[in-house]
């Protein structure tokens, strides 16, 4: 017999922890650049009965019966994704961005082939060739980095390395890079050396959808992304590609990497894509960028140095070396003050990855709450006060009180706290 108790009765420990996490999100300033807050509609889809359905295969071609409804759900997600990004084909089944990237690699290259990708030490991602990740273990990785003069991607170096190593794949994308990615220039280099270009736009997908960052779709063989971050959907992945790669990519996801898709998550993706197709989503993305620029200027006014001097997108990297702080110390101090960031390697970082010399800061989540330029100026000042006295518990307590007061003016998930 099916248990009929609600969560609070069936498992009070988990129910209590969920309430605590919801309260933490509601009462603190979320500045992790890869995090965002989904809408109640997305949450509703995630918690739906679609979680019960197994649906190996693709719409119209399933290995299980009873898929007539989830076929419609998944097709809606596919159609909305294609419309949102102007793509020939979309696969919405990847459980995460890592699986999307794995499928892209396997569709275009063989183990041992050369991949030219941005170094994790300069803002890339684990799946772009880190030796501890499958990508670094299966492929020969040639990393590219930044110019020391302005801390932006050294396109001359990318071209030189491409000509020297003739990679099978040129991977473009980053997890901690605050400047515009010029996909047309990367495509020129890829075409010159006969490489297939793959773009991981996980961080900037929302900006791309809103036309606030150049789109990689016209220039790339394959584009991968997560569906959260700036896109403000559920945690998950997606692949966009040219029609010529559709069959191969689909087979790499299923049966190559994954089994049954998570149809409740796919439904939530469809809801988020529908939200992103509305005019107000473009206005939201504009506010993300505007808020990031105001926050960046405020942090500089507080005496902090930003990598590359600022931002073109939703995030910025703060170099803490002039403050004689590590990212670990800054993350912990800000956390005690109710401000959540993540420690992050900066270019040419002398510290270890679990210590770092920087923090990464982003504006998507605070923008979702409705905060604007005025609040960004205040947030920058609060961060500055904490980093000026990271060991002073009185300062941290005062800032935490101000953070809680600020958040109270921008309530979130009020019915769930």
From Swiss-Prot:
UniProt xrefs under InterPro entries: PyrdxlP-dep_Trfase, PyrdxlP-dep_Trfase_major, PyrdxlP-dep_Trfase_small, Ser_HO-MeTrfase, Ser_HO-MeTrfase-like, Ser_HO-MeTrfase_PLP_BS, SHMT-like_dom
One BP annotation, GO: glycine biosynthetic process from serine
Protein localization: Cytoplasm
Catalytic activity: (6R)-5,10-methylene-5,6,7,8-tetrahydrofolate + glycine + H2O = (6S)-5,6,7,8-tetrahydrofolate + L-serine
NAD in keyword set: no
The EC number(s) this enzyme carries: 2.1.2.1
Keyword Transmembrane helix applies: no
Organism domain of life: Bacteria
Modified residues (N6-(pyridoxal phosphate)lysine): 229
Residues that coordinate or bind (6S)-5,6,7,8-tetrahydrofolate: 120, 124-126
Family: Belongs to the SHMT family.
Assembly description: Homodimer.
Protein name: Serine hydroxymethyltransferase
């Amino acid at each position: 017999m099916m248990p009929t108790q609600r969560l609070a009765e069936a498992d009070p420990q988990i129910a209590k922890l969920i309430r605590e996490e919801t309260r933490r999100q509601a009462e603190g300033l979320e500045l992790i650049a890869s995090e965002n807050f989904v809408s109640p509609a997305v949450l509703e889809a995630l918690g739906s009965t679609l979680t019960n359905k197994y649906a190996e295969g693709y719409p119209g071609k399933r290995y299980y019966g009873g898929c007539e409804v989830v076929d419609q759900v998944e097709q809606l997600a596919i159609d909305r994704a294609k419309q949102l990004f102007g793509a020939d084909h979309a696969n919405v089944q990847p459980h995460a961005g890592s699986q999307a990237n794995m499928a892209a690699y396997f569709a275009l290259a063989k183990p041992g082939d050369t991949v030219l990708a941005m170094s994790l030490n300069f803002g890339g991602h684990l799946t772009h060739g880190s030796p501890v990740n499958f990508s670094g273990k299966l492929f020969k990785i040639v990393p590219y980095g930044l110019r020391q003069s302005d801390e932006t991607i050294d396109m001359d170096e990318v071209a030189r390395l491409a000509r020297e190593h003739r990679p099978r794949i040129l991977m473009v994308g980053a997890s901690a890079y605050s400047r515009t990615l010029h996909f047309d220039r990367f495509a020129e280099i890829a075409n010159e050396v006969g490489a297939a270009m793959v773009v991981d736009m996980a961080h900037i997908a929302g900006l791309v959808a809103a036309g606030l960052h150049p789109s990689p779709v016209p220039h790339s063989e394959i584009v991968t992304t997560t569906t959260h971050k700036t896109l403000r959907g559920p945690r998950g992945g997606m692949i966009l590609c040219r029609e010529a790669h559709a069959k191969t990519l689909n087979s790499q996801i299923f049966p190559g990497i994954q089994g049954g898709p998570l149809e409740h998550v796919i439904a939530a993706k469809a809801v988020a894509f529908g939200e992103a197709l509305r005019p107000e989503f473009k206005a939201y993305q504009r506010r993300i960028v505007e808020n990031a620029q105001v926050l960046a200027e405020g942090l500089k006014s507080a005496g902090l140095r930003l990598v590359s001097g600022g931002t073109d997108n939703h995030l910025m990297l703060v170099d803490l070396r002039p403050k004689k702080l590590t990212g670990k110390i800054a993350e912990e101090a800000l956390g005690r003050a109710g401000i959540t960031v993540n420690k992050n390697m900066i270019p040419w970082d002398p510290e270890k990855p679990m210590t770092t010399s920087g923090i990464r800061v982003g504006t998507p989540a605070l923008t979702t709450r409705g905060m604007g330029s005025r609040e960004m100026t205040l947030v920058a000042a609060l961060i500055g006060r904490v980093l000026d006295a990271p060991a002073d518990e009185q300062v941290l307590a005062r800032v935490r009180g101000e953070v809680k007061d600020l958040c109270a003016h921008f309530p979130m998930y009020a019915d769930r706290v």
